Amino acid sequence: MALLGAVALTACSGGGSSSENCLVFGEVPAIYADYQAQRDKIEESAQKSEASYKKASSQIDELKEQYRARIEEAGKKLDGQPIEISTGEDFKVVSPVSLSFKEFANSVNSMYDVKGDIETAKDINLDVTESWLRSHDVQYLMLPLMLIGCDEQGTEVTSARIGSFQGFKVVDGKLVLPTGTKAKLETVPYGDNDYDNYVRVKSVRLALDTKKL
């Protein structure tokens, strides 16, 4: 995977409080973790009888509605809050990048539109073999743009797809993403209990996912 930039963000402070402000998702990871913990307690306390399961199911439905409201409130706080991006020499931020709460995909899994504009600041050359070039029509090639969270040692601990790039060219037998190519920013979900990973994140960077190559 080719790493193409860096994002300077504030990591979670630790401790599991639902008011903690974690990375681009703000308070959402901590609230989601609270929901999972409360749901687990209800499920564990249910006795092995039809009546107890019905009671637990009702409690979980009520819990879900309460936490959906909290997650939506926290998600809407992200609207218009720019992410400070250190783009390096590969990217240029044309307009500030931020998240905007969109909807719930299901249950308490929330979706966010990625707003703003990012484009390449120079030609980006990608290593591929001649046989790969002969067997692929690059006009249809699309590569994801990833947001990678790293711990204190620089090890990747979280990743999220925030967009994609198209418009690749073959120049002098090499695969190139030309200067000025705009990223198509997409919708990013938060629906995994990644709180423990976000607590460890100390820095975030952008990366072009080149697994397809």
Locations of regions flagged by a protein language model:
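Sec-dependent N-terminal signal peptides
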Residues: M1-G5
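Bacterial signal peptide processing site
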Residues: S13-G15
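C-terminal motif of bacterial Sec signal peptides marking the signal peptidase cleavage site
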Residues: A8-A11
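Intrinsic-disorder/low-complexity, polar/charged segments enriched in Ser/Thr/Lys/Arg/Asp/Glu/Gln
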Residues: M111-K115, D123, K182-K184
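Transition segment at domain starts
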Residues: Q59-E119
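Amphipathic alpha-helical coiled-coil/heptad-repeat segments
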Residues: V24-Y67, A74, L78
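Short, solvent-exposed, Trp/other aromatic-anchored flexible loops in extracytoplasmic proteins
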Residues: R134-V138, P144, C150-L213
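Short amphipathic, basic-aromatic surface patches that mediate peripheral association
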Residues: I118-H136
